[in-house]
């Protein structure tokens, strides 16, 4: 599962609450904008939650280190692309990057994490 977390307002707590609300409905199938049907639903949600956790931890570590946002976003996108190539192959990785702009997911998570530390 590869979520999209672009700025300005990704909110991981609201995502988690939404996932739980949908789980309560016990759907057999999800129809995802741009991605089609997803089943089994629980596996999809577990993958989504895991990806949010892994991605936010990566961004949090980068924010605690040195380097510019651009450097961090580029490194995040490169690592994500490597993950996609490993799991899906080169051609799917190219299509994924063309449709998602994974660097923007870094910026969305970075903004979210910075706002959380300001609260």
Model region roles, listed by residue range:
Residues 58-119:
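C-terminal regulatory/interaction regions
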Residues 6, 24, 28-31, 35, ...:
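Alpha-helical context
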Residues 1, 16, 95:
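Residue-level detector of functional hotspots within protein domains
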Residues 9-13, 100-103:
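Conserved phosphate-coordination/catalytic loops
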Residues 1-9:
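Surface-exposed cleft-lining segments at the edges of enzyme active sites
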Residues 13-69:
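Divalent-metal (often Zn2+) His-rich catalytic cores of metallo-beta-lactamase-fold enzymes
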């Amino acid at each position: 599962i590869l979520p999209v977390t672009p700025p300005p307002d990704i909110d991981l707590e609201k995502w988690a609450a939404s996932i739980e609300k949908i789980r309560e409905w016990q759907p057999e199938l999800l129809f995802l904008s741009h991605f089609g049907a997803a089943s089994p639903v629980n596996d999809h949600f577990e993958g989504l939650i895991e990806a949010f956790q892994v991605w936010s931890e990566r961004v949090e570590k980068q924010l605690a280190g040195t380097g510019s946002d651009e450097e961090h976003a580029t490194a995040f996108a490169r690592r994500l692309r490597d993950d996609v190539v490993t799991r899906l192959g080169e051609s799917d990785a190219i299509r994924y990057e063309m449709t998602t702009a994974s660097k923007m997911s870094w910026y969305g998570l970075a903004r979210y994490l910075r706002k959380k530390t300001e609260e």
